[in-house]
């Protein structure tokens, strides 16, 4: 099995097993698995409206860790570290619902192919309707608006405006 295929399978399996156990007020934002330095790390990103505390991550680790042990056969090729953490200020926007919730916020969008000779945009998400993001961004010193089809978005996340 190819490495990226194995990682995708692990992420899908883990998500399917832990998602039902992460209940309100918590939200499962993302699951990532990969090598950091010489160690494999399974990162589980969670959030809640008022933000995640250290105690929240400890409690969620106690819920998630035993669930991972129930996955048979064991999908992990090596020992790994489990990291339960907040998505941070630049949280990923991986679903249409997450993009919809980000309307009015400053975001970073990467595209599969160029639009107006650009593959990356940062700006305020004005609206998300009918699978189109309307983004207001700065082009040098001028404000511009662009409509980006959701199907062109390779990656989107909240961004910090400087």
Swiss-Prot record:
Full protein name: Ribosome maturation factor RimP
Organism annotation: Streptococcus gordonii (strain Challis / ATCC 35105 / BCRC 15272 / CH1 / DL1 / V288)
Role played: Required for maturation of 30S ribosomal subunits.
Superkingdom of origin: Bacteria
A Gene Ontology cellular-component term: cytosol
Record HAMAP family: RimP
Family of this protein: Belongs to the RimP family.
InterPro entries attached to this UniProt entry: Ribosome_maturation_RimP, RimP_C, RimP_C_sf, RimP_N, RimP_N_sf
Any one GO BP annotation for this protein: translation
């Amino acid at each position: 099995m190819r490495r990226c295929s194995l990682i995708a399978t692990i992420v899908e399996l883990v998500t399917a097993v832990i998602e039902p156990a992460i209940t309100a007020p918590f939200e499962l934002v993302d699951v990532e698995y990969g090598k950091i330095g010489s160690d494999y790390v399974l990162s589980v990103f969670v959030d809640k409206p008022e933000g995640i505390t250290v105690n929240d991550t400890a409690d969620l680790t106690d819920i998630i860790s035993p669930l991972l042990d129930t996955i048979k056969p064991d999908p992990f090729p090596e020992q790994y570290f489990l990291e339960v953490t907040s998505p941070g200020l630049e949280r990923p926007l991986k679903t249409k619902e997450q993009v919809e919730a980000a309307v009015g916020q400053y975001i970073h969008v990467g595209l599969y192919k160029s639009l107006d000779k650009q593959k990356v945009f940062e700006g305020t998400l004005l609206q998300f309707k009918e699978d189109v993001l309307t983004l207001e961004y700065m082009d040098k010193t001028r404000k511009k608006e662009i409509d980006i089809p959701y199907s062109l978005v390779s990656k989107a996340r909240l961004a910090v405006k400087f």
